UniProtKB/Swiss-Prot annotation:
PTM notes: Arg-980 is dimethylated, probably to asymmetric dimethylarginine.
SUPFAM superfamilies given in the database record: PIN domain-like (SSF88723)
Molecular-function GO terms, alphabetical: RNA binding
Record-listed Phosphothreonine modification sites: 653
Protein name: Constitutive coactivator of PPAR-gamma-like protein 1
Biased composition (Basic and acidic residues): 479-500
Cross-referenced Gene3D superfamilies: 5'-nuclease
Topology of this chain in the membrane: Peripheral membrane protein
Length: 1112
């Protein structure tokens, strides 16, 4: 509604203003200096708003998008599009939406609600009919925007990302750089003064790839039909309703324009709810009203007349009306030409200089180098600010962003064809980045031309432990009341403004009581509010301030973000501490598959820890406290806000998620991860990525088992296998993912178009969506860790096609096709699938979960309001003594387990075998694989049974196996009495649930807690673990475990051998780290470890020997 309906109004009611055009003809005409007798002087330069054009860049609404995406088909379409533009004298520049846009958050919330309903309609349609849904239900496949961005970079199409206000930046960028036209589909663009405005929805490429057509909007025809001067468009847009002044606040004004005699007046109030007039009726009525305004410069008089019937917040509405007029006036006025903000010509990747004055976030305080001290750089005047001041407080300095273009045009600069072989495997941002680190004296040194000489991040403790300069500003005490912190306005101002969103309006529903009171005093009955819940300003929640980020790291992040070289989440996490997660296709009635937002939340938690260098900063703090003979400080949790919508979670409020640090090793700071050039730095990047994906195993780095271009695929599948709840992947589903990734048909999109799917599998569609959500998080983690995997090998067209996966899954699940037939009879391909499956399952063992446990809620964190979030599951109170082993207890599994506070950050470990059962240990190296089957072993120390505190039975213990620690206390199984409510056989075991809604809360753990699945109990110290490792022989064996219960292996087949070893099938007790020594090469692939001098054969032999030694 409101201004967003104006674009549809043009399509339906102004047919003469929509003219079909062929872009190749425009590129040969007078617009670019061409004619009948002369060739065009310049290319037709068009700016494309990718946010409105994603479905067209994807290739259109063809039906196979529901299966997770046909990425090679998309790649072929974009290749044809780039070829057609190059041959037709057209230069495209694609602008992606990388802004958080808190001011438009209420629009995003409504859109997520609609897409969530669409997702349920899609699932229901596929379940009932087994056919693809209609194109009107098109829901972009997960990760589509990032895939399109990487594909455009591959085809040398220039890209950029917005950073604050997407619409303002697109409009300003279009004018500032002399683009001939804008390809988009948004009312904000239609109401601004753009010479040539083309439709993104009508953009079509002919089958032969020679004709590129679209529709052009003639805005002077629209103004003629509305009988409205274009100079009055800003007031017209402000009175239609927009993100600043919503149409709910203008509803009474719109109804007053229609009058009581209007045929629709009877619809004004229905069942005490607000009913807005139809959009086309409102547009005509507002146009008539604006046409009759005598003085358009007197905004006070206009606002007084518009809000004459308002009963409350009139002053606030007047202010927001003026802001809305100013917002659209800034986009409508022609801008004086400014020197490009980034490049001399034609300013790719930059921010517009025309953006209205932006109030900087109070959390940011980045020292800028003095521009006057560098006379070679021209000062760019910024509107509403002082000359030479950038429009944003954290803009990159001019000298750093001026590339040396001497002797090279932009096409040559952005071309990847001339990059040497080693350069093609460098991170994406280093190829076109102006930072030249090769000339630096040290790997962590950054050229002073790019970074300011005085960095507030340097301190005497930064080099401790060889970590280099940290990305945190040391020595500053963070407090809630500190000026410049990341706290919301509550921390600094009036409590009534505590949840105000920057640039957004006050929610109309927040004043429902005030409207009701005013209705008794006024003569005009007010229209009831449309919304029954708080919106916009009342959605947000105040969080603790983020740790200050060093200017060097922030400028690098901003530079890569603007140039489209980095995942957009990263910059917003570093600066604002919040992200928005889009809806994917999920069946909310299916209890077997978790929501993607919850499934991959631990990945994001560890990425947050990497971005803020939690491990290193806390380690330094503890060392300083130890030197000063002080107790370790109690660290405040680092909270990130995640806006998401899924089953049981509304997007109206954010979830507070805590950042986590790796316990196995100290991850280096962000500056070293991103800018370090040493071999150790490259190894640490890879280890950090694998640790985030819970895939830190040697086999993942063995190219003989996992090719580099399939590493993301295997990491995501391994992560899905480790989910601690209900099984996600069955054996045949895992084989289907691997078989389609190795199929030659993957790279034949034409053959895949001819492939017929008789009946779509609803579970397969959801698995595809979950997998692509994992790929999305893998791209996020890869960029956050410094791109250890080359971007060419991360793209999903290297390893996934949704339609091909559906075909393989139907054969594997319904027809029970053997693996060799699943691989089209190719024995070599089947052998590769076996190796990849072994690598994915390395170190994982599976056992059946017997009973769910009821858990009492733990106390909430002190700074969260108790009424905001539901409390989480917490631990069961401990017993007196250590239990030996039992089944059916779930914690978060995987290789890294979870950190649980016993007092702030005095942690013990909760680890798990395969992610289904947890165990307590002092370190990961102390985990064993004894008694990991589904049958519970008899405790060797015996036990007794109590009912209501009375002993009613005893039993003797079994003989101790090897590798024991000595006697254990007698086990007590209580039924009823003080311990009632627990399942029988479960002895006081704390279980920490990290997958859930709301913020992550802590439960208390105790050293007396029992072990799980027959594993050693919690080690009180590292010395105890070391003694056990020395005393333990390598002869402990674990029986073959049937994985049929978890859907990974057939019941009649043994556990596959790892790394091709022979002998009795075994499941290793634990997975050793792939990079347990940072000085070792991180990969036997020379592309991933260019500085290694050993031969591939010798490195593979060493890796295999290490794995075999571990197994023995």
């Amino acid at each position: 509604m409101g201004v967003q309906g104006f674009q549809d109004y043009i399509e339906k009611h102004c047919p003469s203003a929509v003219v079909p055009v062929e872009l190749q003809k425009l590129a040969r005409g007078s617009l670019v200096g061409g004619g009948r007798q002369r060739p065009p002087q310049t290319p037709l330069r068009l700016l494309v708003d990718a946010d409105n054009c994603l479905h067209r860049l994807y290739g259109g609404f063809y039906t196979d998008w529901v299966s997770g995406g046909q990425w090679n088909h998309m790649l072929g379409y974009l290749a044809a599009l780039a070829k057609a533009c190059f041959g037709g004298n057209i230069e495209l520049f694609v602008f992606f939406n990388g802004a958080l846009e808190k001011a438009r958050l209420h629009e995003w919330v409504k859109r997520q609600g609609n897409e969530r309903q669409t997702a349920q309609q899609i699932v229901s349609h596929v379940q009932n009919k087994g056919t693809p849904p209609p194109k009107v239900w098109f829901l972009p496949p997960v990760c589509m925007a990032h895939c399109i961005r990487l594909a455009l970079i591959r085809f040398h199409v220039k890209v950029a990302q917005s950073i604050e206000d997407h619409h303002q930046e697109v409009i300003g960028f279009c004018r500032e750089n002399g683009f001939h036209g804008l390809v988009a589909y948004d009312s904000d663009y239609a109401l601004c003064n753009i010479p040539y405005y083309f439709s993104a929805h009508a953009l079509k490429l002919s089958r032969n790839g020679k004709s590129l057509t679209t529709s052009q909007y003639l805005m002077h025809e629209v103004a003629k039909q509305l009988d409205l001067n274009p100079n009055r468009f800003p007031i017209f847009a402000a009175l239609l309703g927009n993100h600043i002044l919503p149409d709910e606040d203008l509803a009474s004004f719109h109804w007053s324009l229609l009058g009581p005699e209007h045929p629709l007046a009877s619809l004004k109030v229905r069942a005490h709810q607000l009913v807005l007039p139809p959009c086309d009726v409102v547009i005509k009525a507002v146009a008539d009203y604006v046409r009759n305004i005598h003085d358009t410069s007197d905004l006070d008089a206009i606002a007084k007349d518009v809000f004459q019937h308002s009963q409350s917040r009139t002053d606030d509405k007047v202010i927001r009306f003026k802001r809305a007029v100013g917002y659209y006036s800034a986009t409508s006025k022609p801008m004086p030409f400014h020197p490009p903000h980034y490049l001399a010509r034609p300013n790719p990747f930059g921010m517009p200089g025309m953006v209205p004055p932006y109030v900087p976030p109070q959390m940011l305080n980045i020292p800028q180098t003095s521009l006057q001290a560098k006379p070679a750089v021209p000062q760019v005047p910024s509107p509403g600010g002082t000359p030479g001041q950038a429009p944003y407080p954290y803009s990159l300095s001019e000298p750093a962003l001026t590339l040396d273009t001497s002797g090279k045009n932009l096409t040559e600069q952005n071309s990847y064809s001339n990059i040497p072989h080693e350069g093609k495997h460098t991170p994406l941002y280093e190829r076109s980045s102006p930072i030249n680190l090769a000339q630096s004296g040290s790997p962590n040194h950054v050229d002073s031309a790019y970074f300011p000489g005085s960095s507030t991040s340097s301190s005497s403790d930064n080099d401790e432990g060889g970590g280099g300069a940290t990305n945190h500003i040391s020595g500053n005490k963070i407090g809630w009341e500190k000026t410049g912190s990341h706290a919301e306005p509550l921390a600094r101002g009036d409590p009534g403004d505590q949840v105000k969103v920057e640039g957004s309006s006050t929610a109309s529903s927040g004043s429902q009581l005030a409207e009701g009171k005013g209705s008794h005093m006024g003569t005009v009955q007010p229209i009831p509010c449309l919304l029954s819940m708080p919106t916009r300003n009342h959605m947000d929640i105040t969080t603790p301030p983020l740790p200050p980020v060093a200017p060097e790291v922030l400028r690098v992040a901003e530079h890569r973000h603007k140039k489209g070289l980095m995942y957009p989440y990263i910059f917003h996490i570093l600066t604002k501490g919040e992200i928005k997660i889009a809806v994917s296709i999920e069946d909310e009635a299916n209890k077997d598959l978790p929501p993607a937002a919850l499934l991959y939340r631990p990945v994001r938690q560890y990425v947050y820890g990497v971005l803020f260098s939690l491990a290193e900063s806390r380690k330094k703090t503890e060392r300083l406290a130890f030197r000063k003979n002080r107790l370790p400080p109690e660290f405040s949790p680092l909270i990130i806000k995640e806006w998401a919508a899924y089953k049981g979670k509304s997007p109206q409020t954010p979830e507070l998620v805590e950042a986590l640090a790796f316990r196995e090793w100290t991850c280096p700071n962000l500056k070293r991860l991103w800018l370090g050039k040493a071999v150790e730095d490259k190894n640490r990047r890879m280890r950090a990525f694998l640790a985030c994906m819970r895939s830190d195993t040697p086999a993942m780095l063995n190219p003989a088992n996992v090719p580099t271009h399939l590493m993301v695929l295997c990491c995501v599948l391994r992560y899905m296998v480790q989910w601690p709840g209900a099984r996600i992947l069955r054996r045949q589903e895992l084989d289907a993912f691997l078989a389609q990734a190795l199929s030659p048909k993957l790279y034949e999109p034409d053959q895949l178009q001819e492939l017929k799917i008789d009946n779509l599998d609803p579970r397969g569609i959801q698995l595809s969506a979950l997998f692509m959500s994992g790929v999305d998080m893998a791209l996020f983690a890869n960029d956050a860790c410094g791109q250890p995997i080359p971007w060419e090998h991360c793209c999903p067209w290297m390893y996934f096609d949704g339609k091909l996966f559906q075909s393989k899954l139907l054969k594997a699940s319904r027809e029970k096709t053997p693996l060799i037939d699943l691989c089209d009879g190719q024995a070599e391909q089947a052998a590769k699938v076996e190796k990849m499956r072994q690598s994915i399952l390395e170190g994982l063992s599976f056992s059946r979960q017997n009973h769910p446990l009821p858990f009492p809620p733990p106390p909430a964190l002190p700074f969260y309001p108790a009424s905001v979030y539901p409390r989480h599951f917490g631990p069961v109170p401990p017993s007196q003594g250590r239990g030996r082993g039992f089944a059916g207890v779930c914690g978060f599994g995987g290789h890294y387990g979870e950190t649980v506070a016993t007092g702030p950050y005095r942690a013990f470990r909760v680890t798990a075998a395969s992610g289904h059962c947890g165990a307590f240990s002092g370190s990961d190296s102390s985990r064993t694989s004894k008694s990991q089957g589904g049958v519970q072993p008899i405790p060797s120390q015996g036990g007794k049974l109590e009912i209501a505190g009375t002993v009613v039975g005893h039993w003797a213990g079994s003989r101790r196996g090897r590798g024991g620690r000595g006697p254990f206390p007698l086990q007590v199984v209580s039924v009823g009495g003080p311990a009632r409510g627990r399942p029988r056989g479960v002895i006081s075991t704390p279980v920490i649930r990290t997958f859930g809604r709301g913020g992550r809360y802590y439960g208390r753990g105790y050293k007396s807690q029992g072990a799980i699945q027959g594993r050693p109990p919690y080690a009180a110290s590292a010395e105890e673990v070391a003694k056990e490792l020395k005393s333990k022989s390598g002869e402990s064996k674990s029986s073959a475990v049937s994985l049929a219960e978890n859907g990974v292996m057939a019941e009649e087949k043994p556990v596959p051998q790892l790394n091709g070893s022979t002998g009795d099938p075994r499941v290793p007790s634990h997975s050793e780290s792939a990079l347990n020594n940072d000085s070792k090469p991180c990969n036997t692939n020379p592309h991933l470890n260019a500085l290694s001098t050993d031969s591939a054969c010798r490195r593979e032999a060493a890796l295999e020997a290490a794995v075999l030694n571990k197994e023995e």
